[in-house]
């Protein structure tokens, strides 16, 4: 402010008399004051007025043509009073409280500039006995309106940029939270399967205990203790499952989203994933027909798994295409296609088996191999089916699900 305002003040003209200048210093000063949050406007006003005064005196001395320092000081004194008056009125009226109301802020800025110009003219009248007429006041008002328009234009552009940046940040946080909750949803599915398994093992152990009770007391006792330990594991898993379910249900996120928004969300997340892996992947999206809002976490956990697998399977460059259509009114079909290496025929029968993987890191460590098995499990649980079809280059995964499991009930 202390540098910009004096420099902007040199873009000037003299519409009223040889002493009263109109420059871009006033709108620039107004713009800076409107950005201040916690600093009282009086202090910046005093410092800016002093900086403008000193800068103008220096320029006059540098240019020469004056009879000593005193006339120069008189010539430039009125500018200091303009900025001081401007800052004091800005502080008294607490103009910054209207930061979110640009029209009101602009009106206050207009009034402040008119009053400050009148103070400057008054100082010049006291020093140089210049004449102040109603026509001059009218000219001042017109100039103040133009200054206010310029400042409010820049201010509105700045506020728009801030709003867009805030909206982008909020969207990124929302997408990140959706991804976290989607991953938690995936873990609850695995945990639910574990609960069923431990329940079955507990029952089988207890039945074995009852069969061995009359035959081998020592062995039956060990079996009973084992059944009890498994039962404790089951209860621990139940507590974890309940906590995860509560956490997912309590998140202030939408459970249902438009199909187009869901697929775009998958694409944005996997664009970042591909970039993190150092790969150049082009993503495409195609939606046929009309679709309801679908369950966010079900769709994300399925489609994002398949899309991430496609990204991982490709080399440096590739293409992934997401398609959505309705074969009929009761079914919806998602397709994930890539132009990667595809799936060889000899592993086609075991590709959905838990633990199977064809992906290894740079150290030769295999991945967990639970992604496709999870997708298969959740699709089966939703009464759907999943298939894959090798193309000339790449593979297409097709997931068909009943619409009733994806849309909001009622």
From Swiss-Prot:
An MF annotation (GO) of this entry: protein histidine kinase activity
Domain of life: Bacteria
Keyword Transport: no
Subcellular location(s) of the protein: Cell membrane
Substrates-to-products reaction catalysed: ATP + protein L-histidine = ADP + protein N-phospho-L-histidine
InterPro entries per UniProt: 2C_sensor_his_kinase, HATPase_C_sf, His_kinase_dom, Sig_transdc_His_kin-like_C
Disruption phenotype: In the absence of nitrogen source, cells lacking this gene do not show degradation of TnrA, which is entirely soluble.
Key words, A-Z: ATP-binding, Cell membrane, Kinase, Membrane, Nucleotide-binding, Phosphoprotein, Transferase, Transmembrane, Transmembrane helix, Two-component regulatory system
Keyword match Cytoplasm: no
Sequence ranges assigned to domain Histidine kinase in this UniProt record: 189-405
GO biological process terms held by the UniProt record: phosphorelay signal transduction system
EC number: 2.7.13.3
Phosphohistidine: residues carrying this PTM: 190
Membrane topology recorded in Swiss-Prot or TrEMBL: Multi-pass membrane protein
Residues annotated as transmembrane: 16-36, 39-59, 72-92, 103-123, 140-160
Residue spans, topological domain Extracellular: 1-15, 60-71, 124-139
Positions in the Cytoplasmic compartment: 37-38, 93-102, 161-410
A Pfam family recorded for this sequence: HATPase_c
Disulfide bonds: none
Gene Ontology cellular component terms for the protein in this record: plasma membrane
Cited function: Member of the two-component regulatory system GlnK/GlnL that positively regulates the expression of the glsA-glnT operon in response to glutamine. It seems that autophosphorylated GlnK transfers a phosphoryl group to GlnL, which positively regulates the expression of the glsA-glnT operon. Interaction between GlnK-AmtB complex and TnrA protects TnrA from proteolytic degradation.
PANTHER family assigned: SENSOR PROTEIN CREC (PTHR44936:SF9)
Quaternary structure (record): Homotrimer. Under poor nitrogen source such as nitrate, the complex between GlnK and AmtB, which are the transmembrane ammonium transporter and its cognate regulator, respectively, interacts with TnrA. GlnK-ATP complex are not able to bind TnrA.
Protein name: Sensor histidine kinase GlnK
UniProt organism field: Bacillus subtilis (strain 168)
